[in-house]
A protein has these predicted regions:
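N-terminal beta-strand-loop-alpha-helix module at the start
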Residues: 1-73
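Solvent-exposed alpha-helices and their adjacent loops that cap or buttress functional pockets
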Residues: 6-11, 30-34, 54, 72, ...
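Structural motif
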Residues: 19-22, 120-121, 223-224
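Long, charged alpha-helical interface segments
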Residues: 151, 158-227
Length: 227
């Protein structure tokens, strides 16, 4: 059973990818960003990071460069990827995977790359929906464990039997991505193999640990407790 402890400012991530959506405001998320061993900015997010006090040397920038001025690109560690089949978030994820490849054998099926995604929601709604859905694609195809962090909560891609450390009263939503078996312990309302995305929303933890029993993949959303 996979265990997901609570996310704190000290939670370790292999990399933090910053998209060009709503930049985080809460101190917990900003501390996670500042503690990151590797920060990757998706194209225009580089300017946001610079405005927030980061230096060009603290980040790698991935994208086609269409939203960055030439002068700014020359200052940055900019990796141009011009193909349009994937969005910048996918390109950044693939780049992180290439940096943690065969030379690091400790990364196996039991040790996925832990990537935190910031700035992936807000602004345009179509980008938000696409980025949230992309978490499952990253989990399935890149052998990463994605965590999408926003000022309101966190999305976690998961599969199979898992347990999550929570605080009773935290709001929980669960989105089914192929489960024929889907059960829970520790939630106010029982879950089942939902066939529509809205059906698993607006649940609540009633115990400090919730357990999910499943036979396939699902996406969990958990609200923060720091408000």
């Amino acid at each position: 059973m996979t265990h997901y402890p609570k996310i704190t400012p000290e939670t370790p991530f292999d990399a933090v990818i910053v998209a060009n959506g709503a930049f985080p405001k809460h101190e917990t998320l900003l501390r996670i960003l500042h503690h990151a061993p590797h920060v990757i900015a998706c194209d225009g997010a580089a300017k946001t990071l610079l405005d927030a006090g980061f230096t060009a040397q603290q980040m790698t920038v991935i994208g086609d460069g269409d939203s960055l001025a030439p002068r700014l690109k020359r200052q940055l560690h900019f990796i141009s990827i011009s193909e349009q089949d994937d969005n910048d978030l996918t390109k950044a994820t693939r780049y992180v995977c290439t940096q943690h490849g065969p030379a690091q054998p400790q990364l196996t099926a039991n040790r996925r790359l832990r990537i935190a995604y910031l700035g992936a929601t807000g602004k345009r709604e179509d980008h938000t929906l696409g980025n949230i859905a992309l978490m499952m694609h990253c989990y399935d195809h890149f052998n990463v464990q994605p965590f999408m962090l926003t000022d309101e909560g966190i999305f976690i891609a998961a599969c199979g039997d898992c347990r999550f450390d929570l605080t009773p009263g935290q709001q929980v939503s669960l989105f089914n991505f192929g489960c024929q078996q889907l059960e829970s312990q520790g939630l106010r309302w029982p879950i089942y193999p939902f066939d529509a995305l809205w059906q698993g929303t607006l649940n609540e933890a009633v115990q400090p640990i919730i357990q999910i029993k499943a036979d396939n993949a699902y996406l969990v959303y958990i609200t923060w407790t720091f408000y």
